[in-house]
Structures are given as structure tokens and as C-alpha cells.
């Protein structure tokens, strides 16, 4: 394994883990986070599956503000140095676009090289239209290849 050519990507829960990793290490040359949950506090309020937070958190966010905030990826975004692509479907009600927009905005404010890719009319998974699924894969590989050739 060439430790100078490590990349990370993941979608949904894997997107959460991608953001978690790049918020804790600089070992990756580039990252692509696909439809991640960024802010657990707001996830409970606008996701189509808000009850799932009960499996991971005791009580509602307003009763456990510090805990929800500490687990939200905005709490570690200040550490990110890895060039990052954020990719989400605009019709995603599982991990809605505002989470990706928040994360991208934070990366931009921090000066991290980043791009936000919005896929129109796509829900969670970005696979309703085959062309969108192919586009998702091309975006991921394009971002990784950009840093593979440096």
C-alpha cells in the first residue's frame, strides 16, 4: 500500500465516516463524502427517518444539545485539510441537501479545497436515473484522479 496515495469515500453512513476520518487525520490525499449526515441535531428535525437517532442518542436533541453537537461533524470540520468533494441528490429526504451545504460552507470558510455537487431530482442513493448514477461515479473518480496525478 502506497501511504502517499490514500483516498477515502463513502455514502450515507459511509459519508459520515468519511467526514469523521478527514476531521481526525490528514493521511488522505482526497475525500468524497456522498449524502452524509453532518448535523445530528437538525437530522432529527428534517430527515424522513428521524426516529433512528433514538438508536444512537438518549432523548431528543433539545434535551441533549451538547451530546448531539459533539457527535455532529461540524464539531471536527475545523481540523479538515483534505481536499473534499461533497455529493448529494437534491431530492434526498434521508440526508437532505442542507447538511451537505453546511459542510461545504464550513470547508469553504476554512479555505479547504472543496466542491459541492448537487444531483437534480435524485433521492438518497442517487440511482433513480442510470445517467445520474454514472455521473455520480464519474464525479467520484474524477476527484480522486485529480489528486492521484499530482
Q: What are these language model-derived features?
A:
Residues 1-150:
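Active-site-proximal cap/loop segments of hydrolase catalytic domains
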Amino acid at each position: 500500500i502506497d501511504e502517499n496515495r490514500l483516498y477515502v469515500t463513502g455514502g450515507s453512513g459511509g459519508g459520515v465516516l468519511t467526514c469523521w476520518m478527514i476531521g481526525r487525520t490528514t493521511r488522505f490525499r482526497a475525500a468524497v463524502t456522498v449524502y452524509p449526515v453532518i448535523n445530528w441535531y437538525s437530522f432529527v428535525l428534517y430527515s424522513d427517518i428521524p426516529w433512528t437517532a433514538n438508536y444512537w442518542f438518549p432523548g431528543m436533541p433539545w434535551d441533549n444539545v451538547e451530546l448531539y453537537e459533539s457527535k455532529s461533524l461540524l464539531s471536527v470540520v475545523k481540523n479538515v485539510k483534505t481536499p473534499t468533494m461533497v455529493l448529494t441528490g437534491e431530492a434526498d429526504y434521508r440526508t437532505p441537501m442542507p447538511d451537505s451545504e453546511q459542510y461545504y460552507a464550513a470547508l469553504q470558510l476554512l479555505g479547504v479545497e472543496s466542491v459541492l455537487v448537487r444531483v437534480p431530482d435524485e433521492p438518497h442513493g442517487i440511482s433513480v436515473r442510470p445517467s445520474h448514477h454514472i455521473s455520480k461515479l464519474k464525479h467520484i473518480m474524477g476527484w480522486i484522479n485529480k489528486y492521484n496525478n499530482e
